[in-house]
Amino acid sequence: MADKIKAAGGIVIRGKKILFIKKNGRWEFPKGRLKKRANKKKTALREISEETGLKKKDLEIIQPLIPTHNHNKANGNISIKETTWFLVKFTGDPSFKLKPEKREGISKCKWVTLNKLEITLKNSRPLVHYLLGFVLNDPGYKDYLKNQRK
């Protein structure tokens, strides 16, 4: 029987930029496991804050996104990770210096403009492409973009 792991994460936006973390050599979005009886929204905000240094008070959940499921096999054990994703807006100072959580294998954090996404996505898993495609075509995100300058 497979172990079931629940996680939550966020696709963080600031103007027309999206936040990525480089974890174990690949670009992805911040996420982490739910602790027992933990709230998914609070977990997503906590993980974003821990992995990037952004303050939770400067993060605002806009809407939930689709969940994803990953199947992993290690040492003969199968695990299924279900991640609940949220679209999150960064409302803090744009000049805030991101602080990657090195102990988690995160070597870098960066804001990527929409026109530079292709370069970043060259070194990311298909799941990241899938989530990004979903977000970029989401009506809520398109409405958000209409009110942004850069």
Task: For the regions a language model picked out, list residue spans one by one.
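Residue-level signal for alpha-helical context at structural boundaries
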Residues: 28, 62, 66, 77, ...
